[in-house]
Every structure is written in structure tokens, then in C-alpha cells.
């Protein structure tokens, strides 16, 4: 890449970043937080944060990348995607009706709410315990990270249930919403994330999600300023780099350490070059249609229910890894949201996917506002826990693609909804058995004496 080509890419990157950052800033000033703000920041991180890192790798370490014209296509496709997404998100198809009483879909009381978070926490802890009994601490047993996807590890499906510890702790926080509950959320979820990091053998997702939710709650409540958020972001990047070194068993120093930091940080937070690789091999892609979305559900079907279930699922990530990169190491490489749309239907699917994503984020914001307006604090805690708990799925959406997001959000909805139903059933059983007693508010002693 020549300096002239780099200068052209830099101009496009600056304009695109300024375009998205400006819209995000205006939205932040208007509402402080909603899921449009979160997705916009996540989109910036995924598709634009990596460009400076790539530039340093190219000019400092002479690392090979896709041709400049392909990198230009990747930047422009990301900017155009966001433009279509933003218009879709801001477009209102019907007039907004305010203060119209509607029959609630469900209600929650104190006992049902506490039962819900206990059930969610129980699902996570029991899954971790069973996985640990089968495999022990994989971080200290396995020699490479790719081994966690091999036949040496049993009970891999249980990992999908670990995450429900975070929604459980979110319910606990939203019932109190003070600084002590906020700090308790951070300590409990990060401690759980470190435990799963050691047990699973290097999975950092629970730690990243817990820290991100903690920061956004702090922004909403005014406990964290923007400069504190930036400082926490830098700390998070350094922390994820250190965990990555431990995960891959790397011992580096000097220039090698700087090089490793650049490419691991890029791959962790901003795999935008994967989109460029897909565009570079565009003519070799056999478009998969909507099949990757259907196939991604296969992993949730147990083999005893479907004995002939394919052992290998050809979703967009695996198609990109195996067919495009010809990589059969056992790891699935993230194609990104736009990359998954390219795998499914080429360039035509990019604006269509942007419209779908705009509607998805609009729905989450509607649910979030519903929780903000809810007078029943127990129901509000459940709604907010569901919305913030789905942040992990939004990260999956940006990094892994639309197919992975759909299957995971449906799974999250089913487990979360089932926990609610079980909590309501248990409350009904306890109430029928006479075990539930209403709380009585005792009058102050002075008032009691006055009435006497």
C-alpha cells in the first residue's frame, strides 16, 4: 500500500467515522442511553476502530492486507449500511400514540421476581458445575485454545447457559438501583466471568459483557463521566489483551509484544479486515440465502432428539472460515454482520440487512422505554434485565452476523421466558399451599399510641 492509497483510505475513514460519531453524539445528548446509541458505538468499534491498528501493522511491521480498493469497499459498505440502518431506525410508520391504557401482557410481583432471578442464576451455576465435573479447569489442561472445540471437551452445549448469570444479577440491580447494587453487579459478574474463563479455557465473553453493562448503567445514572468511560475502555483493552496472552500461552516482549497487541486487539474488537477478505473473494462465494439462519439453530437441538443431526453446522462464520479462508483449525472466524449478509446474498443483502437491523434495534428500544414507563418496579426490573441481558446478542450481531444473532436471541428469549413461567408456577403452588404471606407495614410507635 502506497502513501497515496493510504491517504485516500484515511480520508474515507475519517469522514465515515465522523458521520457515525456525530449522529451517535446527538442521540446520546438527547437520551443519554438507548440501544441505538449502544449499537452505533458497537458498529464503530467493529468496522472502524481497527483501521488505525491495521495501518500501523502495515507500515510498521509490513503486514500484508487486502488490496486498497477492497479496503475502500469495506469502509464504504460499512458507512452505507449505517446510513440505511439509521434512516430505518428513525422512520416512524405510524403516528405515536401516548398515554393510551393497554391491558398488560403480564404482571410481576415481589416473590415472582425474586424466583425468576434465582432460577436464572441456578441455570448458570448448575451448568458451570456440570461442565466443571466433566472437564475441570480447561485453561490449565489444554495446550491450545482450539482444543476447547475438540472431542476432548464434553458438555460443550452447557456453555450456552453460563450467560444467564448476568440477567439474574441485572434483576438484583434493577430492584434497588443504587451504587452499592451497581458495584455488587460488577464484582459478582466479573468474578463469575473469571471463573468461566478458567473452566472453559479462555472464553472472555462473560467478562467483556459484564464490564460493558456496568459502564453503560453508570452512564445512565450519571455515576460515570465520558472521560471515565474512555479510561475504562483503555483499561478494558489492556485487560482483554492480557487475557488473550494467557489464553494462547504467549510470552512476548519488545517489538513482538507491540505487534501481538496490535493484531490481537484488532481481531478481538474490530475484525473489519474479515469483511475485506470476503469482498476480495466475492466472485468465489456460493451465496447461501437464508440457510445459515436455519442451520444455526441445529446446535440447540440435542442429538438424542435428532440422531442424524449434522455434527458440523455451515453457518456464515463456518462458511467464511472453511470455504473462503480454507482454514480448518477448528476455530470459527467472525465474518462480521455485513460479511454474514454478503455470504447469504451478496451486495443486495447489505441494504436489506440494514433495514432488518434497524427494526430489531427499534424493537429493543421500545421494550426499554416500556420498562422506563412501567409503574410496577418488579415488572420494570424484568423488562430491563431482558433488554440489558440481550446486549451479548447484539455483540454477536455485530461480530458474528445476523444468522448467529437470530438463533441466540431466540434461545435467550425461550430460556428467559421459561424462567418467568416457572417462577409464576412456583408462586402459584406456594400461594396455594399457604406459604405466601403479604407484607404488612407497621405504623410508627407514636402513631399507634395516638390511636390508642
Curated annotation (Swiss-Prot):
Annotated Gene Ontology cellular component terms: plasma membrane
Keywords: Cell inner membrane, Cell membrane, Membrane, Transmembrane, Transmembrane helix
Protein name in the entry: Probable ECA polymerase
NCBIfam families: PRK02975.1
Quaternary organization: Probably part of a complex composed of WzxE, WzyE and WzzE.
Lineage: Bacteria, Pseudomonadati, Pseudomonadota, Gammaproteobacteria, Enterobacterales
Pfam families: WzyE
Membrane topology value: Multi-pass membrane protein
Disulfide partners: none
TM helices/strands, residue ranges: 6-26, 37-57, 63-83, 118-138, 155-175, 181-201, 207-227, 228-248, 341-361, 378-398, 410-430
Job of this protein: Probably involved in the polymerization of enterobacterial common antigen (ECA) trisaccharide repeat units.
Originating organism: Salmonella paratyphi B (strain ATCC BAA-1250 / SPB7)
Homology family: Belongs to the WzyE family.
GO BP field: enterobacterial common antigen biosynthetic process
UniProt xrefs under InterPro entries: WzyE
Subcellular location(s) of the protein: Cell inner membrane
Pathway note: Bacterial outer membrane biogenesis; enterobacterial common antigen biosynthesis
Domain of life: Bacteria
Amino acid at each position: 500500500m502506497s502513501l497515496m492509497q493510504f491517504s485516500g483510505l484515511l480520508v474515507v475513514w475519517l469522514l465515515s467515522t465522523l458521520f457515525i460519531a456525530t449522529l451517535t453524539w446527538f442521540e446520546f445528548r438527547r437520551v443519554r442511553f438507548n440501544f441505538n446509541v449502544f449499537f452505533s458505538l458497537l458498529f464503530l468499534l467493529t468496522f472502524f476502530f481497527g483501521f488505525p491498528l491495521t495501518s500501523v501493522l502495515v507500515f510498521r511491521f509490513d503486514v500484508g492486507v487486502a488490496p486498497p480498493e477492497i479496503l475502500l469497499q469495506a469502509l464504504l459498505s460499512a458507512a452505507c449500511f449505517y446510513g440505511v440502518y439509521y434512516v430505518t431506525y428513525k422512520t416512524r410508520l405510524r403516528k405515536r400514540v401516548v398515554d393510551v391504557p393497554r391491558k398488560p401482557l403480564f404482571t410481576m410481583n415481589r416473590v415472582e421476581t425474586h424466583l425468576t432471578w434465582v432460577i436464572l442464576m441456578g441455570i448458570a451455576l448448575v451448568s458451570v458445575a456440570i461442565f466443571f465435573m466433566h472437564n475441570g479447569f480447561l485453561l490449565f489442561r489444554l495446550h491450545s485454545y482450539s482444543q476447547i472445540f475438540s472431542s476432548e471437551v464434553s458438555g460443550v452445549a452447557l456453555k450456552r447457559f453460563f450467560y444467564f448469570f448476568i440477567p439474574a444479577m441485572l434483576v438484583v440491580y434493577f430492584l434497588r438501583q443504587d451504587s452499592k447494587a451497581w458495584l455488587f453487579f460488577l464484582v459478582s459478574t466479573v468474578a463469575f466471568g473469571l471463573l468461566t474463563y478458567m473452566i472453559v479455557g479462555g472464553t472472555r465473553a462473560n467478562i467483556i459483557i459484564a464490564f460493558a453493562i456496568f459502564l453503560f448503567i453508570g452512564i445512565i445514572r450519571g455515576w460515570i463521566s465520558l472521560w471515565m468511560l474512555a479510561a475504562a475502555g483503555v483499561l478494558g483493552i489492556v485487560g482483554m489483551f492480557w487475557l488473550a496472552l494467557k489464553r494462547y500461552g504467549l510470552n512476548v516482549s519488545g517489538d513482538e509484544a507491540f505487534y501481538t497487541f496490535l493484531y490481537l486487539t484488532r481481531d478481538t474488537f474490530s475484525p473489519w479486515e474479515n469483511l475485506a477478505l470476503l469482498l476480495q473473494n466475492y466472485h468465489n462465494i456460493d451465496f447461501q440465502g437464508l440457510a445459515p439462519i436455519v442451520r444455526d439453530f441445529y446446535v440447540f437441538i440435542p442429538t438424542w432428539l435428532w440422531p442424524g443431526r449434522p455434527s458440523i453446522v455451515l453457518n456464515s462464520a463456518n462458511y467464511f472460515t472453511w470455504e473462503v479462508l480454507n482454514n480448518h483449525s477448528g476455530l470459527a472466524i467472525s465474518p462480521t454482520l455485513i460479511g454474514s449478509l454478503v455470504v447469504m446474498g451478496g451486495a443486495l443483502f447489505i441494504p436489506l440487512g440494514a433495514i432488518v437491523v434497524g427494526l430489531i434495534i427499534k424493537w429493543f428500544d421500545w421494550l426499554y422505554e416500556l420498562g422506563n414507563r412501567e409503574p410496577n418496579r418488579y415488572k420494570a426490573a424484568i423488562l430491563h434485565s431482558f433488554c440489558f441481558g440481550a446486549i451479548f446478542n447484539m455483540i454477536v450481531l455485530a461480530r458474528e452476523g445476523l444468522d448467529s444473532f437470530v438463533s441466540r436471541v431466540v434461545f435467550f428469549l425461550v430460556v428467559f421466558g421459561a424462567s418467568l413461567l416457572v417462577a409464576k408456577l412456583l408462586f402459584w403452588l406456594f400461594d396455594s399451599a399457604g406459604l405466601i404471606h403479604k407484607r404488612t407495614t407497621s405504623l410508627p410507635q407514636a402513631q399507634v399510641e395516638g390511636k390508642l
